[in-house]
């Protein structure tokens, strides 16, 4: 007992500077009224609806020049992601693609929501959408392997980015009757609701990460938490949780992020508390869910009509974004809400879309997640300008020449083979409606005057082949002067790299051709995930902390940039510099300066946890330590003063003068250390406890006649 008590003295909970006054408690309803509550049964009685994510995220039906296994595409796949490739890297060609492998008649394309741009016509609930294609060698009774989507999309590159657990080569689908854990509160017998079981199985068919024990447990915890809750669409609330998590899995998020995605609304909309999630899933998941809750509260209360209030809430939002993974979850949550926005009244749709276009779409853009950025912008465009969206959708559909795209793909493939240039994918694509709309406004053009609406995308092995392929393209078709853009040598602000050229295709129709490597494509589609690879080499901190510091510095910059804008155009979302670096002439750089006015934002690291904290102008390191709490005021669980000192390091340099002023973007590390005087006091206190223990045990042994010793 004495030994255990002595050891416990050095295991008292660490101080937590990270949980500052800027944390926000949020326990009210979710974003706007999208998630209406109902006391009706959890299971939905609505008829199956084909669409939604099956259109947006399904892989394509492809004709491979290699001998790859054939598959059975779903209806959504045939409509939304039709393309042509020659490898198993089938998801490389993007969201909007055409293919010569399957011809669809024009009458079929002109049916409701069945055009090549049907993904832009508005979201449809995907609760009963068919799963992704299953290869023919799949024995549905449990025999052979299941292959869903691309088997190699996240191998290596994105997997290293944020610890991806995505694996498309799953041997089996774990059914809920075989759970490797036991649910609490007698939930084991209640969990077999058909809609929940089917929802989990569909998720498992698409992503193996949904077979992870923690993910399955989170699924059933979310089902229990949201049971009886219905969304405005009429779907069970659990469906939104799973769709959000599936969006995260699509970009390679690991199990911690996916679990937090499933649970992201439990703090605001259920009986669950932070402590409950902490006990059940650990601090990593609990902190992420709390971070998403903070962002959700700010989004709910944001009033874009009042610039002063908006500025205050935006800068608080930035402070809440210390963990970038929470932002990923919030972006996925917002994307799925936008996909089901049709269920809200028109006024609320407009307000929700305006906020998304002003805050969340630019955020996805700056992080380089182009697939999410495009979807958010197009959905906002649909609800903010429905007439223009409808008119441009019809024009884009009418201008689509499937035969021309098919011919161009085949022609380019033959030329590449003749030159001995290997490639992964050749696919058709078109410019997003919102991008076309912005270009028309900016350059005062008609839709017919824009040359890069339709085009091809070519994915090759390496950078050298990019330039070789460019030469092949210019031999096949005549180049439009002044339209060549080399983003490989001069990347865009968010790290985007590619070669762009415009040529006159067959029939004198302008055709934009994009050429990039597989790595460049993954960077373009999942920029944030692709960028955050774990760093190698000798580091004083864990790679995760270093990444968080980069994120915090970038947040500080974006704060100043956003606050400096005086009502910019809705189409101008391009920042001056890319995450996490800064351009040399960037006026919002975090480089320390002596003439800083207004509040100062400082990155604080303690016990490998990081927070972004706001301090008044002219604050010092001493002020920061005072906020952290003096050592003499900290008490351990044994009522012994925890007199450790916080030894600060400012930008990796020990601080000798506590009156040193803090500057924008400073990194302050707080390292606890026990001074010599306190060590002496600890030893004396331990000795006194030991003596009291001996004094108590001697009369007790004498009374009972029991021999107690340290050894045998």
Curated annotation (Swiss-Prot):
GO terms for biological process: guanosine tetraphosphate metabolic process. One of its GO terms (molecular function) is GTP diphosphokinase activity. SMART domains: HDc (SM00471), RelA_SpoT (SM00954). SUPFAM superfamilies: HD-domain/PDEase-like, Nucleotidyltransferase. Keywords: ATP-binding, Chloroplast, GTP-binding, Kinase, Nucleotide-binding, Plastid, Stress response, Transferase, Transit peptide. It is an enzyme of class 2 (transferase). It is found in: Plastid, Chloroplast. Residues 1-64 form a transit peptide. It catalyses: GTP + ATP = guanosine 3'-diphosphate 5'-triphosphate + AMP. Residues 65-74 have a biased composition (Low complexity). It comes from the Eukaryota. Its EC number is 2.7.6.5. Residues 65-84 are annotated as: Disordered. Residues 237-338 form the HD domain. PANTHER family: GTP DIPHOSPHOKINASE RSH3, CHLOROPLASTIC-RELATED, GUANOSINE-3',5'-BIS DIPHOSPHATE 3'-PYROPHOSPHOHYDROLASE. Probable ppGpp (guanosine 3'-diphosphate 5'-diphosphate) synthetase that may be involved in a rapid plant ppGpp-mediated response to pathogens and other stresses. This is Probable GTP diphosphokinase RSH3, chloroplastic. It comes from Arabidopsis thaliana. The lineage of its organism: Eukaryota, Viridiplantae, Streptophyta, Embryophyta, Tracheophyta.
């Amino acid at each position: 007992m004495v030994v255990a008590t002595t050891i416990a003295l050095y295991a008292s909970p660490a101080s937590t500077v990270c949980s500052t006054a800027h944390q926000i408690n949020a326990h009210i309803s979710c974003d706007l009224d999208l998630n209406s509550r109902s006391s009706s049964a959890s299971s939905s009685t609505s008829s199956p609806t084909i669409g939604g994510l099956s259109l947006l995220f399904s892989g394509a039906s492809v004709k491979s020049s290699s001998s790859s296994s054939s598959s059975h595409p779903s209806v959504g796949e045939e409509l939304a992601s039709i393309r042509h490739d020659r490898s198993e890297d089938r998801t490389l060609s993007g969201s909007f693609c055409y293919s010569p492998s399957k011809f669809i008649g024009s009458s079929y394309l002109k049916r409701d929501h069945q055009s090549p741009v049907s993904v832009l016509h508005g979201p449809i609930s995907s609760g009963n959408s068919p799963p992704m294609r299953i290869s023919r060698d799949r024995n549905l009774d449990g025999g052979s392997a299941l292959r869903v989507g691309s088997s190699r999309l996240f191998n290596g590159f994105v997997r290293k980015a944020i610890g991806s657990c995505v694996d498309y080569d799953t041997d089996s689908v774990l059914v809920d009757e075989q759970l490797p854990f036991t649910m609490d509160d007698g939930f084991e017998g209640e969990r077999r609701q058909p809609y929940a079981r089917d929802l989990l199985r569909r998720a498992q068919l698409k992503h193996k990460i949904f077979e992870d024990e923690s993910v399955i447990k989170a699924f059933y915890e979310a089902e229990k938490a949201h049971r009886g809750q219905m969304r405005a669409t009429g779907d069970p609330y659990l469906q939104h949780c799973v769709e959000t998590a599936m969006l995260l899995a699509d970009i390679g998020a690991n199990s911690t992020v996916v679990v937090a995605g499933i649970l992201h609304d439990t703090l605001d909309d259920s009986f669950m508390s932070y402590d409950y999630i902490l006990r059940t899933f650990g601090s990593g998941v609990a902190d992420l869910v709390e971070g998403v809750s903070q962002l959700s509260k700010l989004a709910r209360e944001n009033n874009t009509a009042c610039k002063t209030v908006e500025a205050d809430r935006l800068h608080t939002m930035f402070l809440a974004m210390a963990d970038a993974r929470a932002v990923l979850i919030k972006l996925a949550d917002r994307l799925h809400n936008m996909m089901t926005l049709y269920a809200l009244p028109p006024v609320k749709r407009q307000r929700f879309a305006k906020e998304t276009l002003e805050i969340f779409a630019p955020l996805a853009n700056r992080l380089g997640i182009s697939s999410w950025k495009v979807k958010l912008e197009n959905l906002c465009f649909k609800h903010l300008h429905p007439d223009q969206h409808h008119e441009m959708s019809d024009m884009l559909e009418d201008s689509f020449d499937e035969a021309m795209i098919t011919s161009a793909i085949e022609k380019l493939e033959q030329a590449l083979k003749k030159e001995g240039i290997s490639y992964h994918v050749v696919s058709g694509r078109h410019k997003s409606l919102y991008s076309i709309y912005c270009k028309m406004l900016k350059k005062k053009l008609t839709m017919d005057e824009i040359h890069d609406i339709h085009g091809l995308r070519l994915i090759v092995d390496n950078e050298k082949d990019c330039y070789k392929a460019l030469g092949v393209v210019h031999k096949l078709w005549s180049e439009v002067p002044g339209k060549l853009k080399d983003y490989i040598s001069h990347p865009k602000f968010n790290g985007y790299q590619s070669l762009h050229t415009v040529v006159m295709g067959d029939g004198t129709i302008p055709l934009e051709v994009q050429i990039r490597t597989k790595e460049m494509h993954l960077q373009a589609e999942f920029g944030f995930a692709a960028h955050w690879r774990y760093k190698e080499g000798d580091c004083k901190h864990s790679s995760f902390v270093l990444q968080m510091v980069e994120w915090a510095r970038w947040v500080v910059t974006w704060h100043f940039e956003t606050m400096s804008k005086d009502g910019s155009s809705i189409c101008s979302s391009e920042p001056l510099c890319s995450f996490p670096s800064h351009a040399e002439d960037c006026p919002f750089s975090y480089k320390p300066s002596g003439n800083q006015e207004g509040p100062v934002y400082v990155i604080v690291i303690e016990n490998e946890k990081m927070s972004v904290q706001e301090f008044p102008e002219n604050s010092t390191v001493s002020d920061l330590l005072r906020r952290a709490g003096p050592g003499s005021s900290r008490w351990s669980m044994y009522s012994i003063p925890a007199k450790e000192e916080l030894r600060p390091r400012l930008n990796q340099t020990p601080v000798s003068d506590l009156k040193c002023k803090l500057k924008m973007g400073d990194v302050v590390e707080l390292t606890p250390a026990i001074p010599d005087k306190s060590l002496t006091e600890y030893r004396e206190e331990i000795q006194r406890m030991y003596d009291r223990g001996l004094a108590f045990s001697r009369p007790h042994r004498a009374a009972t006649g029991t021999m107690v010793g340290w050894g045998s």
